[in-house]
């Protein structure tokens, strides 16, 4: 046999195939695991991609589908745009609520209430699924939900009734569309005569010259005309979906990757070490026959490749096949309309699966064949080199955390919790209980140089994840939660929203920007205002500090905010300094002190104006302030509104008012922080669990000879398990203390009153149950007698 060439492939092939036949259940299990772990990412990642794409397509369709949305402006702007409508370069739009229905041959009618959009030209609203978009006078398209409610078919005459009698008429149904982001939306889009649309609310155009020239461009410079861009609308919709519906999806992607990686490694390891004819036994037999060690290992290891690579390839193909057959059904679960075809983005899941397979094979090779030799002087004095510095670091961390809670060291909580968690590993592995028996002393001294730094890193990760999770949960409790602000709305936009959401708009606050075509209106702090009085109204240096500047808004004189300021822009006498700035020269042209009605905490938010004056107040008249067509909608209790209504309001503003700017303090930040608060402990659990598992396996391998010697002397299983006690205590007790230190470092219960913050939640405790279960399993495994391959 020794004369046989080492690269003799015939024998090694028979050995590999024989090993697979000898372990049929494990071979099938490995193949199935590879197949399923490839199918799952393909379906999940493609579903996520189509979810976002549907939101973007829905935003584009509901915004009108044209490059620009134009709203607001003076009568001169309206006249200019009407001329563009007549020239075919722009389309007038009017949206309202009304009834759509059909009358059957028997005389019975079926009606439903819908959002109706009237256009002067071709429609691009919605995603067309049947027929074609209306483009001629008296043509209409219905959403699929509206058509189903009235049982309408293409070619039917649809009766439209609304508050505008000129638009109430019969229209021919020529198209069925759908809001790709929400298929339950009930709406209709009709083309009417160009002469019928009075009080046009908005104009749509693809013509760059329309928005960049003439009166539209002139008034847009002073915010009197709002211009929305379809690209911005799509981008805002995508950001909203990623922040609200899919917060932390990248973190959960990493968690999925690590979970599948763990499953692969576990099944591959079991495949190699299972049964009496294990991979180790086959490797030893091949080495005894004269094959090199690497060739012997590869002979068995490639059996893993034979199972996993075909399984993953079939899983990828099956995943795309399943997704191709079911993506419409999956989309309907989320009330979305999905269209899918293979693209470069959809193929990213292949790289995801390939990365899992490659990493699992590499790590499995290390787990199976990597060996570390330990050569240390077995003496208890070596423990002092770990106990003394780690104890000092732990004491310092406790002091740092105490100083943090005493409001002395702002970063003491973070630094102390991380350093303390890091010091726990070497300290617990070196405490005196390890030296009660010579066997324990010998076992731990041989592995401490590896286990101490590894445990330190694992516990550091657990402590940091607990700290991070607590901080993220506290961040969700900020005092500005619940505020919803939509800026740059026009009066027509407000009328539309008030008609659709009357209860919400009745409780909301509507701020109106002053007309700034002649001068900019700003409020100044007392220091900035005094500087203007002393050095002259044209001294811009007095007003150069941006912290001293805030906007001034107008509000209905009966509003509770009329005459109010924030805490910064009110002088000692209760007045507020108002400064008027020439927009052309940026010079201060006028300054005046106006009396106020006190302060309001709502105006302290950075997104709110610093001073609010009543529209008809003497202060506004003295300054010559006139209202513009730019409005800001403020909803102070947005989370208390039903979830469906919140989503509808948000979508209407994003899609129908592409020029609007939304600031939302509740759901986006809350969900994003919540996702991170969950994902970080989950990631730390997986990584630290794998680290402890690898360390435990390595520790048992290093104790193999010692354990065999102890067995020959007749030790019990409990005594064998005691060899794992130092590492087990470090894993369980160390993890508990580490996450508790992280929680202490994140909890500001002494630094500031608790009512100013949220709670730390309980997600930081995620690692502990997993680590406890893992410790118990390794205790059982270490209690098993050592087995030698025959």
Language-model regions, residue ranges each:
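Membrane transport/envelope proteins' first extracytoplasmic loop
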Residues: 1-265, 269, 274-278, 307, ...
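Alpha-helical transmembrane segments, especially those used as permease/efflux helices
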Residues: 1-33, 40-43, 245-264, 302-313, ...
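Short amphipathic alpha-helical coupling elements at transmembrane boundaries
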Residues: 18, 53-60, 284-288, 441-446, ...
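The feature marks short, hydrophobic/small-residue-biased sequence motifs that occur predominantly
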Residues: 44-45, 87-136, 175-176, 509-617
């Amino acid at each position: 046999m020794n004369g046989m060439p080492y690269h003799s492939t015939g024998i090694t092939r028979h050995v590999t195939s024989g090993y697979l036949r000898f372990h049929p259940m494990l071979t099938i299990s490995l193949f199935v695991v590879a197949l399923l772990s490839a199918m799952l990412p393909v379906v999940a990642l493609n579903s996520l991609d189509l979810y976002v794409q549907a939101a973007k397509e829905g935003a584009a369709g509901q915004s009108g589908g044209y490059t620009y949305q134009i709203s607001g402006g003076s009568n001169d702007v309206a006249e200019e745009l009407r001329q563009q409508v007549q020239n075919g370069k722009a389309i007038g739009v009017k949206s309202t609520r009304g009834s759509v229905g059909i009358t059957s041959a028997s005389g019975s009618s079926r009606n439903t209430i819908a959002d109706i959009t009237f256009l002067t030209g071709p429609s691009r609203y919605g995603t067309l699924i049947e027929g074609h978009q209306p483009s001629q006078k008296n043509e209409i398209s219905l959403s699929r939900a509206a058509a189903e409610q009235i049982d309408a078919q293409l070619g039917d005459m649809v009766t439209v009734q609304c508050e505008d009698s000129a638009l109430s008429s019969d229209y021919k149904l020529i198209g069925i569309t759908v809001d790709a982001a929400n298929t339950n939306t009930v709406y209709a889009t009709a083309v009417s005569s160009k002469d019928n649309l009075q009080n046009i609310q908005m104009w749509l155009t693809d013509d760059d010259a329309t928005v960049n020239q003439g009166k539209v461009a002139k008034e847009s410079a002073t915010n009197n005309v709002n211009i929305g861009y379809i690209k911005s609308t799509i981008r805002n919709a995508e950001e909203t979906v990623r922040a609200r519906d899919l917060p932390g999806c990248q973190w959960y992607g990493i968690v999925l990757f690590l979970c599948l990686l763990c499953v692969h490694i576990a099944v591959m390891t079991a495949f190699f070490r299972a049964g009496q004819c294990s991979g180790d036994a086959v490797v030893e037999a091949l080495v005894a026959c004269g094959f090199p060690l690497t060739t012997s290992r590869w002979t068995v290891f490639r059996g893993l490749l034979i199972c996993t690579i075909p399984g993953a390839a079939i899983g990828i193909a099956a995943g795309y096949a399943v997704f191709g057959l079911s993506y419409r059904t999956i989309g309907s679960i989320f009330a979305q309309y999905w269209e899918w075809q293979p693209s470069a983005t959809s193929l990213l899941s292949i790289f995801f699966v390939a990365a899992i397979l490659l990493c699992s094979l590499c790590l499995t090779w290390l787990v199976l064949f990597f060996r570390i030799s330990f050569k240390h002087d077995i003496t208890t004095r070596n423990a002092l080199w770990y106990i003394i510095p780690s104890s000092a670091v732990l004491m310092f961390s406790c002091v740092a955390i105490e100083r943090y809670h005493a409001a002395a060291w702002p970063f003491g909580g973070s630094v102390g919790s991380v350093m303390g968690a890091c010091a726990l590993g070497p300290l617990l592995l070196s405490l005196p209980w390890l030296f009660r028996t010579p066997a324990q002393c010998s076992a731990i001294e041989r592995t401490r140089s590896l286990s101490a730094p590894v445990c330190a890193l694992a516990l550091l990760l657990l402590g940091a994840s607990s700290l991070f999770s607590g901080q993220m949960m506290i961040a969700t409790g900020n005092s500005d939660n619940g505020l919803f602000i939509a800026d740059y709305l026009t009066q027509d936009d407000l009328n539309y929203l008030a008609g659709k959401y009357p209860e919400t708009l009745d409780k909301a606050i509507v701020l109106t920007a002053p007309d700034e075509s002649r001068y900019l209106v700003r409020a100044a702090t007392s220091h900035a205002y005094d500087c203007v009085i002393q050095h002259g109204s044209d001294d811009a240096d007095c007003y150069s500090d941006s912290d001293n500047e805030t906007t001034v808004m107008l509000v209905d004189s009966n509003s509770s905010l009329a005459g109010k300021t924030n805490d910064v822009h009110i002088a000692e006498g209760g007045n507020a300094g108002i400064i008027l700035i020439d927009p052309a020269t940026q010079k201060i042209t006028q300054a005046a002190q106006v009396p106020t009605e006190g302060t309001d905490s709502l105006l302290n938010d950075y997104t709110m104006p610093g001073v609010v004056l009543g529209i008809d107040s003497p202060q506004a008249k003295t300054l010559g302030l006139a209202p513009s067509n730019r409005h800001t909608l403020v909803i102070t209790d947005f989370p208390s509104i039903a979830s469906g209504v919140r989503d509808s309001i948000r979508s209407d503003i994003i899609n129908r008012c592409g020029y609007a700017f939304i600031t939302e303090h509740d759901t986006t930040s809350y969900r994003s922080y919540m996702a991170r608060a969950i994902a970080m402990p989950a990631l730390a659990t997986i990584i630290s669990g794998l680290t402890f598992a690898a360390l435990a396996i390595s520790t048992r391998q290093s104790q193999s000879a010692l354990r065999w010697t102890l067995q020959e002397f007749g030790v019990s299983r409990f005594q064998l398990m005691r060899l794992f006690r130092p590492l087990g205590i470090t894993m369980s007790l160390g993890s508990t203390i580490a996450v508790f230190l992280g929680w202490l470092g994140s909890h500001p219960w002494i630094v500031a009153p608790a009512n100013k913050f949220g709670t730390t939640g309980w997600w930081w405790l995620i690692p502990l149950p997993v680590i406890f279960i893992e410790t118990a399993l390794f205790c059982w495994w270490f209690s098993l007698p050592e087995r030698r391959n025959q």
